[in-house]
């Protein structure tokens, strides 16, 4: 393969013919492949089936988990999540199977009531705003969009969001009420915030007294290498600056046990814990304590969680490697037409193609039987300013399907690139 960027129009047309023939071969296969969402595969969920073997319903303190009560969650469940997140059990609220629901509920509290330090509910603020590191998690952005909260893009780097920009915007504009963050193995780049980035979040001054950091630790134990990466605990780092009330940390067992039957958790300050419980107690008496107990008995402690996640890692690494190897073999020789991330953990690989090509790549893949996350989905309002980013989710399909999908993707990337270059030369 030659460098596409150095080809003449005639050479590009010849390459286009070859690629279209290869593409038609894929279309003729009648493929049905899906790499659109970061879901655990059946082989991963099978690892946690022993969770259902426990029939015990009595908590350590004698609480009958079958009954009402314990809004904040069973103490042993709070202790387990506290150990995973690096906070005291008393600062943990254990919810249902969805941490996303907890995030939605907290934005709703801000919107409807405000927080103790709020001058007024967010709904009464003229043009309330959120900072959104990009590319980021599409479902975060859907929450703020649902409430009509304006979203501001903040560029990401391997060290985290552009903190100069975050500090400037949040420090000057009181209508900016929060920021979405995935600090460890970020969705979708797989970046982990540097210690300095975390500490700048902890210390920064904000114009809004009720500025909130939605700190989504979705991948806190989801390592893909022998290196166990851990970031400073934002809630603890914020205390010396008196900023602990601005921190909402989230995690869940969605990608540890079962996405549809797991347990979620929120960590926050003492003051915020009291306030959140005051709001939640009107809505629910308690979440599923039997499920909390099952998870505690199965996972036991942080060491147990890490041991369980090692089993996940053994199944996932070959799939991630297959994507990266195929990209390197089939795209690198074509010149600087694409690059991709090399995550040490998490659930995704970011593929960056030439500006103006991502939507076309996704379209070609779909028409050949491979569904990807929509181009632009990792940006607020679904609008990628460069039309260059695609999120690759290699976790759910089988290894053979990942290999086949990766090969097809490279054909689509190359074809879209050649089309783009020919259009530029026309």
Q: Predicted regions span which residues?
A:
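N-terminal "arm"/small-domain region of PLP-dependent enzymes with the aminotransferase-like
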Residues: 2-72, 76-83, 367-370
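Short, solvent-exposed loop/turn segments at secondary-structure junctions
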Residues: 38-42, 99-100, 136-138, 159, ...
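Conserved core of the PLP fold type I
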Residues: 63-209, 220-242, 408-426
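Conserved core segment of the aminotransferase class I/II
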Residues: 123, 236-317, 330, 418
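Conserved PLP-binding active-site segment of the aspartate aminotransferase-like
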Residues: 350-355, 372-412
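Short amphipathic alpha-helices in soluble, non-transmembrane regions
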Residues: 361-367, 405-410
